Amino acid sequence: MTDQIIINNAQREKAKAFLRMHQTEGMFVIPNAWDAASAYIYEKAGFAAVATTSAGIAYALGYPDGEQVSLEDLLFVVKKITGRVQVPVSVDFERGYAEDPMQVKENARRLLAVGAVGFNLEDGQADGRLSPSELQIQKIQALCELKKELDLPFVINARTCAYWLNIGSEGEKLAEAVRRGNAFAEAGADCVFVPGAMNQETARALVSGIHAPLNLILNGVYHDFAGLAKLGVRRLSTGSGPVRYLCEETIKMAEDIKNGNADAVLQSTFSYAKANAFFQK
């Protein structure tokens, strides 16, 4: 049975604002949060929107990435985030938590009901293969139907994992990413996301070949913000980099304390009082 949801004016305005960010010239950086605290930190830092990271949410719940987090857990986390920040929130929807496009639509409806205004929908499977592009197109079309039903212009960010999964030669990856990106845009996606480590020339080729706003991910090969903006990249995601950085620091801290060294923790200037003041609205 289809759940009936009510979209209020505030959520509708957030959706419109988030869509405009993709339609306006110039690149914006969107950080990926894994809980309400990280989303709140990003908002206070001045970011105009935040997205979730499936990897980060999985790590925060004690799991590896790769479709380990249930839809119920995702709904819980997203509701906590949207209840704490005022900026638009986009959700890493993985493959939509279903293969049936109509079930993907209903799953998206449930996430919209807790305040989401955007979705990353990917074609990469946990076994390292790409889903058939025809199936991905049907899922995108189902989300477009939901937009019309709710009169809510939420952002569909269609992700293709040709580079992320390192499928084929360099030329084959580029051709497949461009082919899928254009097919997804034609199906109704508002933006095309091609994550993966890539150089400047690959980024330029993707901007040129994909006839839709392009989203790339921060990576160690080429991460010149000004250079990416000049190429025409519209959206730059931090991905799971920040949460992995914090996990690494926490692991080091745990090892130090286990070995009798608490200097790093005790020397922190982020006192109890400062922490409470920071998170006080």
Where is each model-derived feature located?
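Extended, intrinsically disordered, low-complexity segments
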Residues: 2-11, 18, 241-281
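Alpha/beta enzyme core
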Residues: 3-238, 245-251
